[in-house]
Design a protein with these regions (language model features):
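Short solvent-exposed strand/turn elements
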Residues: 85-103, 358-374
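Small/polar beta-strand repeat architecture
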Residues: 303-380
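Short aromatic-cysteine micro-motif
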Residues: 65-66, 92, 97-287, 392, ...
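GGW-centered surface loops in extracellular recognition modules
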Residues: 10-82
Length: 524
C-alpha cells in the first residue's frame, strides 16, 4: 500500500501523500472511486478492503443503516484537447480526467484547460467529493437503503412503492417528487441524487473506456469500441442488450432486476463488474438500465398557447394572437391538426408580428394544410445555484426551498439555456447522444456551456436520431415541460437507448411510474 502519511487540521485532512485519496488514472485499477480524505463523518464506517485498491470494496463505505456508498473524489476534466493522449482516436470527444493531486486548485486546472466538474460544488463551496449510493434504493425497514440484491423502490404503488417508507419521520408519496423525502428517511443530510452527480459518473465511465486497453480493470471493455460502456439490464429479459452474457436476478415485477444483481447464476462473461461505472467490483452499479432514476438540479417553467393558423409557405408562419415570443426563442409544437408534419418537434422562431412568427428553416409548402389547433410551448429552464445545498431542496412547488414552482426557482436556481436540436429535418424529440464525430460535450471551464456539461446535456450538433457508440447510443429526449423532473439511466426494457448518459426531459414532478426509482447521495 502507498505511503499514507496525513496532516489534519481538526478533523479535516489538509495534506496527504496517498494517491488513493484521488480519483485515480483512467483505465487503471481503482479509477473512479477513492478513499475518503479525513476522519469519517458520523454513521460511516470502512468496509473490509476500503483502503485497498485491489479490493472489491475499495472506496466503498457503509452507513449505519447498512447502505453501501462509494466515495467519488473531486476531479477535473478536459474535453477535445489536441494535447490529449486520446485525441488521435476520439478527436473532439477525447476526455481527460485529473485529480487534485495534479491540480491543487480550480484556477490551476482552468489555466491548463481543465474544468472542475459542477458535481463538486454544493452549498456555495467546492467539495472534496461526495458519497453516492452503490446500488439503487430498496426498502430497508422503512429506510431507502443502498443494498445489494434488494428490490428496487419505485414511484408507483404496484412496484415496491416509496410511499411505504417511514424512516426519520418522513411522509413519502408515490410521485417523482416523493424521492426527496424518500432520501431523507436515511437522514436529514442525504438527498436524492443530482443530475450533476450522475453526469460526473457518466463522464468517468466514458473516460475509463477511452483509456482502457483490456478488460483487466474495465470488465465491460470492448476493443472494437462498439459496446465500450457499462452494461445494464435493458433487453426486457433480465440481460444486457450490449452483452447478453450478463444476467440479473428478477425482483418479481416484470423484468426488473434486483439491485446490483448482475452476474446472477454465474457462467462465462456473467460478472458483476460489467454493470459498474468503472468496470470493477468497487464501482457504482446499474447506472445503465434496470430503473430510471430521479435526478435533481434542473427544472423548467413552461406555458402553452393554441395555434390559430399555420401557412403552407417557406418559411412556415404560425398565427397565435399575442404570442409574446422573441427572435431566437425555442418552442415545441404538438397536436396540430392537418399539418401534422409540425408535431413533436422543437423550433427556433423569428417574430414577424405581434400575432405571427415563422419557424426558422421550415418549408411547409408541401405539408398538408393546417385545419385546427395545436399547442406551442415555450419554457424557461433553470439549474441549481452553486450556493444551493442539494439537501435543502423540498418536494413542493410553492415554498422558497421547493425544487419546483416560481418561488423555489427564484430562491434556489439560476437561468439555464440548454442546447436543442432545432434544424428542420433533425429536430424531433427523440434524440441520442452523438452525431458522427461532432463534439458532444462543451469544453468550457465556466458559464452556461460549463453547466451543460455538468448536467451531461449535449451540444445541439452533438445529438442525432442515430447517436454514436462512444456514448452508448444513449437516449436524449428533448422536451419543454412545466415542472420538469429529470430522470436518468433508462429502464429494463429500453434496449440500447438506456445507458449511463440516458436522459429524459419529458417527465414532471407528479408522475408515478413503476420503472422510476431513486438512489441517494451526501456531501459532507
Amino acid at each position: 500500500m502507498a505511503n499514507t502519511a496525513k496532516i489534519y487540521l481538526g478533523s479535516v485532512l489538509v495534506c496527504n501523500i496517498n494517491p488513493q485519496y484521488e480519483i485515480g488514472v483512467a483505465g487503471t485499477m481503482g479509477f473512479g472511486v477513492g478513499v475518503y480524505p479525513g476522519l469519517l463523518p458520523p454513521g460511516f464506517s470502512e468496509m473490509d478492503g476500503t483502503l485497498n485498491a485491489a479490493s472489491p470494496n475499495f472506496g466503498n463505505y457503509q452507513y449505519s443503516d447498512g447502505s453501501v456508498m462509494a466515495w467519488i473524489p473531486r476531479f477535473y476534466y478536459r474535453i477535445g484537447a489536441a494535447a490529449s493522449d486520446r485525441y488521435a482516436t476520439y478527436g473532439a470527444n477525447a476526455i481527460d480526467i485529473a485529480g487534485v493531486d495534479t491540480y491543487a486548485t480550480t484556477a490551476l486546472a482552468n489555466a491548463a484547460g481543465f474544468a472542475l466538474h459542477r458535481a463538486f460544488i454544493d452549498g456555495g463551496a467546492e467539495k472534496a467529493g461526495f458519497f453516492f449510493d452503490k446500488y439503487e434504493c430498496s426498502n430497508n425497514s422503512g429506510v431507502a437503503s443502498s443494498l445489494k440484491n434488494g428490490n428496487p423502490l419505485s414511484t408507483a404503488a404496484a412496484h415496491n412503492p416509496i410511499a411505504s417508507l417511514t424512516g426519520n419521520g418522513q411522509t413519502v408519496t408515490n410521485f417523482y417528487h416523493g424521492c426527496i423525502p424518500a432520501a431523507k428517511t436515511r437522514g436529514n443530510d442525504f438527498h436524492c441524487i443530482s443530475r450533476f452527480q450522475w453526469a460526473a459518473l457518466a463522464l468517468l465511465a466514458t473516460a475509463h473506456g477511452q483509456a482502457a486497453t483490456s478488460a483487466t480493470y474495465c470488465a465491460w471493455y470492448d476493443s472494437g469500441l462498439t459496446t465500450n460502456f457499462p452494461k445494464g439490464n435493458t433487453n426486457n429479459a433480465l440481460k444486457s442488450t450490449g452483452d447478453t452474457a450478463v444476467v440479473w436476478q428478477s425482483d418479481g415485477y416484470s423484468n426488473c432486476g434486483k439491485t446490483g444483481s448482475a452476474g446472477y447464476g454465474g457462467g462465462a462473461g456473467n460478472v458483476f463488474a460489467k454493470s459498474t461505472h468503472n468496470g470493477q467490483n468497487c464501482g457504482v452499479a446499474d447506472l445503465n438500465g434496470n430503473m430510471w432514476e430521479v435526478t435533481l438540479g434542473m427544472t423548467c417553467i413552461a406555458a402553452s398557447k393554441t395555434i390559430a393558423g399555420a401557412t403552407q409557405a417557406n418559411p412556415c408562419e404560425i398565427n397565435i394572437v399575442g404570442h409574446g415570443y422573441a427572435n431566437g426563442d425555442v418552442v415545441m409544437i404538438t397536436s396540430a391538426g392537418g399539418m401534422t408534419q409540425l408535431n413533436d418537434k422543437l423550433y427556433t422562431v423569428t417574430k414577424t408580428g405581434d400575432d405571427t412568427f415563422t419557424l426558422d428553416g421550415v418549408d411547409s409548402s408541401a405539408f398538408t394544410a393546417w385545419t385546427t389547433g395545436g399547442s406551442v410551448t415555450k419554457g424557461a429552464f433553470y439549474v441549481a445555484k452553486e450556493a444551493t445545498a442539494m439537501k435543502a431542496f423540498t418536494s413542493g412547488n410553492s415554498a422558497a426551498t421547493d425544487h419546483w414552482g416560481a418561488t423555489g426557482v427564484a430562491a434556489m436556481m439560476d437561468a439555464l439555456t440548454p442546447a436543442f436540436a432545432t434544424t428542420s429535418g433533425a429536430n424531433g424529440l427523440d434524440q441520442r447522444y452523438g452525431n458522427s464525430t461532432n463534439q458532444v460535450l462543451e469544453e468550457e471551464t465556466s458559464g452556461n456551456a460549463w453547466l451543460l456539461t455538468g448536467l451531461g446535456l449535449p451540444k445541439a450538433a452533438g445529438m442525432s436520431a442515430g447517436g454514436s457508440s462512444l456514448f452508448g447510443l444513449d437516449y436524449y429526449y428533448q422536451y419543454v415541460r412545466n415542472e420538469l423532473c429529470l430522470i436518468s439511466g433508462g429502464r429494463w426494457s429500453n434496449t440500447s437507448p438506456a445507458g449511463v448518459w440516458s436522459l429524459s426531459l419529458y417527465n414532471i414532478r407528479t408522475y408515478s411510474v413503476a420503472s422510476v426509482g431513486l438512489r441517494c447521495a451526501i456531501y459532507v
